């Protein structure tokens, strides 16, 4: 068995089911959980709170270097509590405004470098489930098991619409679809760490597939890869 803690990476676009699967896998294996997207959302929220322009790479990078963020175990409703500068921002970082802002700050190379070490520090025993967009390609390129979840833009927009409606937000599905398509284009075509599957990742299209079936595919793949890697 390796002396290092094993890492399972889960990448893919927003709304593909990464967060749900990551939480289920973390509970299944009893491992640590990293929501990489939350880190960028927290940074974006911190920028908004401190009135830092999202286009100011230097200021955002400085903010990232001193970002005070914690991930704490939550209750049944929130698998992970996200705390920024002592304040619970678990709900605040999930707004569409924060989501769009996170994608913008994540496009800056210096910002990504500033947060890279923070993300890697989450790799602790007994293991880590890392949910993000470049976990398997950049942050944990040697992870023994890698997953890439995707789904049609239309289905992802519908899922996001349902989530926001349940939380009482008044949203238009056509606007959500346009924002998702715009974000996909930005994430997939950015010059640094574009959103692409790792060469050795299992790609799962979750369009029209139940969460239980997706989870079963993931567990089977992870178990095979961990066994082959000596974990």
Swiss-Prot record:
Molecular function via GO: ATP binding; CMP kinase activity; dCMP kinase activity
Enzyme's top EC category: transferase
Major site of localization recorded for this protein: cytoplasm
CDD domains, per the entry: CMPK
Organism: Shewanella amazonensis (strain ATCC BAA-1098 / SB2B)
A cellular component annotation (GO) from this entry: cytosol
EC number: 2.7.4.25
Protein name per the record: Cytidylate kinase
Superkingdom as given in the UniProt entry: Bacteria
Locations listed in the record: Cytoplasm
Sequence similarity: Belongs to the cytidylate kinase family. Type 1 subfamily.
Gene3D superfamilies assigned: P-loop containing nucleotide triphosphate hydrolases
Annotated catalysed reactions: CMP + ATP = CDP + ADP; dCMP + ATP = dCDP + ADP
Pfam families: Cytidylate_kin
Keywords, comma-separated and alphabetical: ATP-binding, Cytoplasm, Kinase, Nucleotide-binding, Transferase
